[in-house]
Regions:
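Conserved, mostly hydrophobic/aromatic
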Residues: 7, 62, 87, 103, ...
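Conserved anion-binding
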Residues: 2-6, 12-99
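Expand to "…catalyze enediolate/carbanion chemistry for C-C bond making/breaking, isomerization
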Residues: 23, 27, 93, 107, ...
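C-terminal helical cap(s) of enzyme catalytic domains, especially alpha/beta-barrels
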Residues: 32, 115, 129-153
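Acidic, divalent-metal-coordinating active-site segment for phosphoryl/phosphodiester hydrolysis
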Residues: 105-117
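As written
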Residues: 10-12, 118-119
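Short Gly/Pro-enriched loop/turn and capping motifs at secondary-structure junctions
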Residues: 68-70, 105-108, 128-129
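A short hydrophobic/small-residue beta-strand
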Residues: 14, 39, 121-122, 128
Length: 153
């Protein structure tokens, strides 16, 4: 909570907090909203989506960490697909509008499947910046994301 004002004073329009670091997640989300920012909540790979259920109507974004936070270049954790699918199903069932973002191990090899499962935003670090050809890597990733969207009709 003590970081909200410094971020908003710096011009932030979206603040994402980790569920695991907030003992009073609802209070933190409401604090962010009252400061005029959109709110996001992130979950680590071992955290169940079920823990977010009470807060989902209040957030603008859910960030699924698909690697353990801390350093780049880790492999995508396969159980993240089920989390994305479940978050998308809840969003549909409750007619909510939060975005689903995925960060960690995102590559052109899994981008299509991530979009098909319900992801809206993909964060690709190492797969782009360590590719040797950033422009080509971004183009390939974008193409795979668009293929996933086309598959969804």
């Amino acid at each position: 909570d003590s970081y909200v004002e410094p971020f908003t004073d710096a011009g932030a329009n979206l603040i994402t907090v980790h569920q695991e670091t907030c003992p009073h997640l609802h209070r933190t989300v409401q604090h962010i909203k009252s400061a005029g920012c959109q709110t996001g909540v992130a979950i680590n790979p071992a955290t169940s989506v079920d823990l977010l259920y009470p807060i989902l109507p209040d957030v603008d974004l859910v960030l699924v960490m698909s690697v353990n936070p801390g350093f780049g270049g880790q492999s995508f954790i396969e159980s993240s697909y089920e989390k994305i699918y479940k978050l998308d199903a809840i969003r549909e069932q409750l007619n909510l509008n939060y975005l689903i973002e995925v960060d960690g191990g995102v590559t052109s090899n899994n981008a299509t499947q991530l979009i098909r499962k319900g992801a809206d935003v993909l964060v690709a670090g190492s797969s782009v910046f360590k590719s040797g050809d950033i422009e080509s890597a971004i183009g390939d990733l974008t193409s795979k994301m668009n293929a996933g969207r086309a598959d969804m009709g």
